[in-house]
Amino acid sequence: MATPGRPWAQARSAYRASEVLRRVTGRRRDPGPQSNGPGREDARAPGRLARLLRQLRAEAASRSEVPRLLKLVERAGAGAAGAGERTGAHSRGSVCSVCGEPRGRATYPAGVLEVSERRLQEGLAAVREELGAEIEALRAELRAELDALRALLPPPPPSPPARREPRAVPRAAPRGPTLLRTLGTVSALVAASRPADDAPDGPAECGAHRAPARKNHKKMPVPPGAPQGGGD
């Protein structure tokens, strides 16, 4: 008597095995370069194969004969392992496209970074030269347009003459001390230029020399014994 649910489990196992076989066949038909490292689906494929093999072996253990589906899955697993070994041997001397370090699963051969860098430098040099030529042409065109605009503009008005700033007049020093010093100097010179005979004998005669003596109209008392009159 058949166990209930067994056909559904077999159908599900067959579907999984067919999916695995389809993916393995697709990888064999497309030998082009893959991305660095296995993808998410490819990384899960060996685990799925292992689970499927365990399920099929458990089912085959309950039967006396090994089903044909188990043989197909084992053959597909062996083919996937051989393809992985060939890919590893092919990419053994390759380097990473990002960091340049040797990696087992890299798809770029050794030396490709140097070639890519050289081509990139050549391309950059060509672009730089082309841009420099275009910039020079634009500069010449702008210079010609500016010259034409300057020719159309009216001449500028004459600039006014430069104003001279008034010169600062030095302020006069106070006259009092200077005048006193000048008078003192003149008095000293006059006193030094007089002869020695005309020098006054005392301070009383200084005023008589400077100004004539005024005539005294008052009668002076005559001492006794003195001649009277204004004779010679």
UniProtKB/Swiss-Prot annotation:
Residues 19-31 have a biased composition (Basic and acidic residues). Residues 19-47, 80-101, 151-179, 191-232 are annotated as: Disordered. Residues 211-220 have a biased composition (Basic residues). Belongs to the FAM246 family. This is Protein FAM246B.
